[in-house]
Amino acid sequence: MTTQRSPGLFRRLAHGSLVKQILVGLVLGILLAWISKPAAEAVGLLGTLFVGALKAVAPILVLMLVMASIANHQHGQKTNIRPILFLYLLGTFSAALAAVVFSFAFPSTLHLSSSAGDISPPSGIVEVMRGLVMSMVSNPIDALLKGNYIGILVWAIGLGFALRHGNETTKNLVNDLSNAVTFMVKLVIRFAPIGIFGLVSSTLATTGFSTLWGYAQLLVVLVGCMLLVALVVNPLLVWWKIRRNPFPLVLLCLRESGVYAFFTRSSAANIPVNMALCEKLNLDRDTYSVSIPLGATINMAGAAITITVLTLAAVNTLGIPVDLPTALLLSVVASLCACGASGVAGGSLLLIPLACNMFGISNDIAMQVVAVGFIIGVLQDSCETALNSSTDVLFTAAACQAEDDRLANSALRN
């Protein structure tokens, strides 16, 4: 009987709800820190191992995902998706810009073990641009070893375009390697409850329970900014497109797409739900069959918010000054980073080091910021995915309805 129960228990742990397991890890970590401070400090090793695993897998993840995405792009797909693509890009940038404003209005700080004395902050936008350009020409092996994500992106894009001219066997190999790395990332993230248990325990034992308020404030800023985008920014963009009350469409998409995405925590997994909603709205099949999968890849407003808010929280913690041009550049960089976060649970968190590179923040400190993101990720990742996925179908519907209105008005004039 014992041998039959063990596999069942292991299967439940391996395939159970990650959100529930992280919640359990949070609660157990808080309890251990409250009961025994020495024991809580000792289990901090679990958190250290988890962060180390993230540091190891993040650079190769970015390289393979971007390279495979570009290499396997299909040629000759003729669909009328330019307005939708424009809305995707504009919405993602608007979300990053809103996150910058929100972060300046409600500044947050993090509890990081490294001091600001190890940081060499850039003096302004000129130095930031110089650092970006120099990072772009880094040796690819050196970029992978040192976590230079800007250099990794440049090499991934270049190799991706080069491989588009390769044969199908090569493209399939790159795609298989990308899937293998994604599997490794999922494997690491399955250990998130244990890692977060160690991180929460050691953090509370070291800094006290006041740390929870810092995380709570950060979570309020993140979720508040996502609500602002979902209920203010997106409706404005939809109104600009369809020129009528956008809220019936906005609320429908949040209810019938966002709720599902909140629990699945994957834009890719929510694609069938969005397809069904598009069919229910009588949208053009040739359009939404392309725009919905495309949106699951590049329409990442929630990810842009997460990257921007957590990066500026780290910058604020380390006392690095940020001028307006640098903040605007961060919005652009965060928007570009967000496009690489598709289909991976916690993907936006793993791309935070790229944005942190702008401010001279080391990879070690950046991965501590990622760890903080995992601690609050129970709600953050769910809200982020709900915003991302519901916006896919929202912008598709807005563009299709605007095109239908244009054709109808054109027919009336004739």
Curated annotation (Swiss-Prot):
Residues 2-15, 67-83, 164-179, 239-299, 353-414 are cytoplasmic. PROSITE patterns: NA_DICARBOXYL_SYMP_1 (PS00713). It comes from the Bacteria. One of its GO terms (biological process) is threonine transport. It holds the Pfam family SDF. Keywords: Amino-acid transport, Cell inner membrane, Cell membrane, Membrane, Symport, Transmembrane, Transmembrane helix, Transport. GO terms for molecular function: neutral L-amino acid:sodium symporter activity. It is a multi-pass membrane protein. Residues 37-45, 105-142, 201-217, 321-331 are periplasmic. Coiled coil: none annotated. Involved in the import of serine and threonine into the cell, with the concomitant import of sodium (symport system). Belongs to the dicarboxylate/amino acid:cation symporter (DAACS) (TC 2.A.23) family. This is Serine/threonine transporter SstT. It comes from Shigella boydii serotype 4 (strain Sb227).
